[in-house]
Amino acid sequence: MSATTAEFFRATHEEWGVEFDFNHGLASIDGKDGRVVGVTTDDGRTLPADVVVYGIGVIPNTEIAEAAGLAVSNGIEVDERLVTSDPDISAVGDVVSFPCAQLGGAMTRLESVQNASDQARAVAARLTGDGGDYRTLPWFWSDQGHLKLQIAGVAHGYDHTVELPAEAGQKTVLCIKDGVLVAVETVNGPADHMIARRLLAERPELSPEEAAAEDFDFRAWADSRVAVGAR
């Protein structure tokens, strides 16, 4: 996610009464009579709490792969066909580090339902004789209150963002890297999201200046690129 969209959600949650405390961890979870009553931070503060929610799963579980002698680096390494260093073993999902076509083949690990499901389909197709390289465009979503965040593409390494004019309650952010549109982030904007999913696999060229121009029409521009790609 771009800093532009992340800042929007941070500010929105703060408007809803959420308080963020970044760059600190927990030293302990404090309890009394079998119930949590607070937490102590690693800088010595005590915060009252009725409920503590763990966020887990960020570190890939590669123990079985390592025991099997498979290559591991930020996940189980696979090639374009999702085959591990052992040609008889394939791997898919959040635990896999794969060459992402949208990032020029850079080894990438994605944590999303779409990626895990589509990788599984790709392996199944290959095993039944009807599959090639995994090149599916990544996309993501998150429902937060009345806001639906949808992301098409991968914004890793973007160098410019352009926020398009939008109706109240909506947002569309274009993420550009080296003059190529690499991701589109929308809030309550399903039409722009679906357009982006059709478009981004072609890695369309788009300069920040063109995207920021007052007369830039994203949907018309996207339609012209899709039409060219279909020829």
Question: Which positions does each model-derived feature cover?
Answer:
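Rossmann-like dinucleotide-binding cores of NAD(P)H-dependent redox enzymes
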Residues: 1-28, 115, 136-141
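A general beta-strand register signal
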Residues: 21, 40-41, 143, 176
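Feature captures the FAD/FMN-dependent oxidoreductase FAD-binding
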Residues: 28-35
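Hydrophobic alpha-helical segments, especially N-terminal targeting/anchoring helices
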Residues: 30, 40, 78, 175-177
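Mid-to-C-terminal Rossmann-like scaffold of FAD/NAD(P)H-dependent oxidoreductases
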Residues: 95-194
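C-terminal auxiliary extensions adjacent to catalytic cores
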Residues: 167-229
